Regions:
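Single-stranded RNA-binding surfaces
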Residues: 1-198
Length: 198
């Protein structure tokens, strides 16, 4: 889960409002239309402030938006189970120590639901001072409690570097392949729980 791949659309299924993609594993993945970021859709030059006639109307029919052979960057949302392939998304999320970067989801962002009360307000104030590029958003994790804007910005800069490396790697070759593998449980535990003062 959370691994990032370059994927190739192999079949568009209008009745499912989804497509199947080859992402370099034995089974093809399932990519619902609602999980495809605007950057991959035709006519994506539309300004965000233009009026929508409902989500479906702004995007048109799925078979008009996507084509077989089209390449996308996808992230595993749910692992393969039984005879079902993995559920995928193009809305990437990269977890750092204090933040989660969503590089192609400008409408996301905020503070983890687990943070409450005054700590939530303090964390919201700290992330409001971050230099988040347009078209991206961040979520402050519980580990961000008590951290200043400078520490959070350092984490954001690292995540931005990681995202640029993922984008660059996706351009190096065509076809389906693994771009980024989520760290092991041990590495994630160290990232999330180890503090210099321990």
């Amino acid at each position: 889960k959370s691994n990032i791949y370059k994927a190739v659309i192999t079949r568009v299924e209008p009745s499912l409002e989804a497509c199947f993609v080859d992402y370099g594993t034995e089974r093809h993945g399932f990519l619902p239309f609602k999980e495809i970021a605007r950057q991959y859709l035709k006519g994506r030059g539309r300004a965000d402030n233009e009026a929508d006639e409902g989500e479906g109307a702004s995007r048109g029919r799925i078979q008009d938006q996507l084509r077989e052979g089209m390449e996308l960057i996808v992230q595993v949302d749910k692992d393969e189970r039984g005879n079902k392939g993995a559920a995928l998304t193009t809305y990437i999320s990269l977890a750092g120590r204090y933040l989660v970067l969503m590089p192609n989801n400008p409408r996301g962002g905020g503070v983890s639901r687990r943070v409450e009360g005054e700590e939530r307000n303090e964390l919201r104030d700290a992330i409001s001072g971050l230099d988040v590029p347009q078209g991206m958003s961040v979520i402050a994790r519980t580990a961000g409690i008590g951290r200043g804007t400078e520490e959070l910005q350092w984490d954001l800069n690292y995540l931005m570097q990681l995202w640029r490396a993922i984008e660059d790697a996706s351009k190096l070759q065509s076809g389906a392949f693994l771009i980024y593998q989520e760290s092991s449980l041990v590495i994630r535990a160290i990232r999330d729980y180890f503090h210099p003062d321990i």
